[in-house]
């Protein structure tokens, strides 16, 4: 079972907005996003620490998934979407005109709400991104498959059926396969958009344990509507409401002694 008291020794609890560049994975400055005339995000300012799990929480429609999708520019695919401000990934401005979007998305992997394996074998799902990069050597691909599936805690369950269709896996196994597919290309950041909302409690626990393990190698940002889950898996938590960042800090502090009444009301179920 994973520990609920992660090592946060390099930060004091409320220093999250004063991180050094060295400890910062993602720096968001004055980020505003509009869909047409509708404001979805307003003046978001935050630094996300590397090698930690950061959770975005908030009521439905608050902007948390929109913010998550800004980190790998998925919102570029939305018509009439306008973005102002900046996001830096390890110092690189991802909204700079010269940014290569495919390269960015190799650096920032993403897993969505419902498992979405490709209609291919388990093996081909994992190597899909590697093949796109031009990697063809069988030995390299085989090693990458084993490493990614082990990292996703799936190897022992599928090692004898790698060439079977991925649709034959359970929902929880499919989601772990999707995570393996994302990490096979070795991203720096892994974005998880409500990754357990379509899963049963046992599969949810398995994914939560996996998230805790993944932070040893990746910076993880998760959107979840489940506050108990955010409290269990995150080192830092951001409460977002009506497109604004209300409060952001150490997860234990957010869930036990939040500064803002709005945060307290949401966490205690008085609204939202």
Swiss-Prot record:
BP GO annotations: phosphate ion transmembrane transport
Localization per Swiss-Prot or TrEMBL? Cell inner membrane
The GO terms describing molecular function are: ATP binding; ATP hydrolysis activity; ATPase-coupled phosphate ion transmembrane transporter activity
Q: Cell membrane among the record's keywords?
A: yes
UniProt-annotated binding residues for ATP? 58-65
KW Aminoacyl-tRNA synthetase (keyword) present: no
Mind listing the UniProt keywords for this protein, alphabetically?
ATP-binding, Cell inner membrane, Cell membrane, Membrane, Nucleotide-binding, Phosphate transport, Translocase, Transport
Gene Ontology annotations for the cellular component aspect, listed alphabetically: plasma membrane
Which SUPFAM superfamilies does the entry link to? P-loop containing nucleoside triphosphate hydrolases
Q: What is its EC number?
A: 7.3.2.1
The enzyme class is translocase
**What's the domain of life for this entry?**
Bacteria
Q: How does it sit in the membrane?
A: Peripheral membrane protein
Name the Pfam families for this protein: ABC_tran (PF00005)
Q: Which part of the chain is the ABC transporter domain? A: 26-267
How does the record describe its quaternary structure?
A: The complex is composed of two ATP-binding proteins (PstB), two transmembrane proteins (PstC and PstA) and a solute-binding protein (PstS).
Q: What does this protein do?
A: Part of the ABC transporter complex PstSACB involved in phosphate import. Responsible for energy coupling to the transport system.
Q: Which PANTHER family has this protein been placed in?
A: ABC TRANSPORTER I FAMILY MEMBER 17 (PTHR43423), IRON EXPORT ATP-BINDING PROTEIN FETA-RELATED (PTHR43423:SF12)
Q: Which family does it belong to?
A: Belongs to the ABC transporter superfamily. Phosphate importer (TC 3.A.1.7) family.
Q: Could you tell me what this protein is called?
A: Phosphate import ATP-binding protein PstB 2
Gene name of the record:
pstB2
């Amino acid at each position: 079972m994973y520990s609920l008291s992660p090592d946060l020794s390099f930060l004091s609890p409320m220093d999250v907005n004063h991180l050094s560049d060295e400890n910062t994975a993602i720096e968001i400055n004055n980020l505003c996003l509009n869909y047409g005339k509708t404001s979805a995000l307003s003046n978001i300012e935050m630094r996300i620490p590397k090698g930690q799990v950061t959770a975005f929480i908030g009521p439905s429609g608050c902007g948390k998934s929109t913010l998550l999708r800004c980190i790998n520019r998925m919102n570029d695919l939305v018509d009439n979407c306008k973005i102002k401000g900046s996001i830096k990934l390890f110092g690189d401005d991802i909204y700079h005109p010269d940014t290569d979007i495919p390269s960015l998305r190799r650096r920032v992997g993403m897993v969505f709400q419902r498992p979405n394996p490709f209609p291919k074998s388990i093996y081909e799902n994992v190597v899909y991104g590697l093949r796109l990069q031009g990697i063809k050597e069988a030995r390299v691909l085989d090693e990458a498959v084993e490493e990614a599936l082990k990292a996703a805690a799936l190897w022992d369950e599928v090692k004898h059926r790698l060439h079977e269709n991925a649709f034959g896996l359970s929902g929880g196994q499919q989601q772990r396969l999707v995570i393996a597919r994302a990490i096979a290309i070795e991203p720096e950041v892994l974005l998880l958009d409500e990754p357990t909302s379509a899963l049963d409690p046992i599969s949810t626990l398995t994914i939560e344990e996996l998230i805790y393990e993944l932070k040893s190698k990746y910076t993880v940002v998760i959107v979840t509507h489940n506050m108990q889950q955010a409290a269990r898996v995150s080192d830092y938590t951001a409460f977002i409401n009506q497109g604004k960042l209300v409060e952001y800090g150490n997860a234990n502090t957010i869930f036990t002694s939040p500064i803002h009444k709005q945060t307290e009301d949401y966490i205690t179920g008085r609204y939202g």
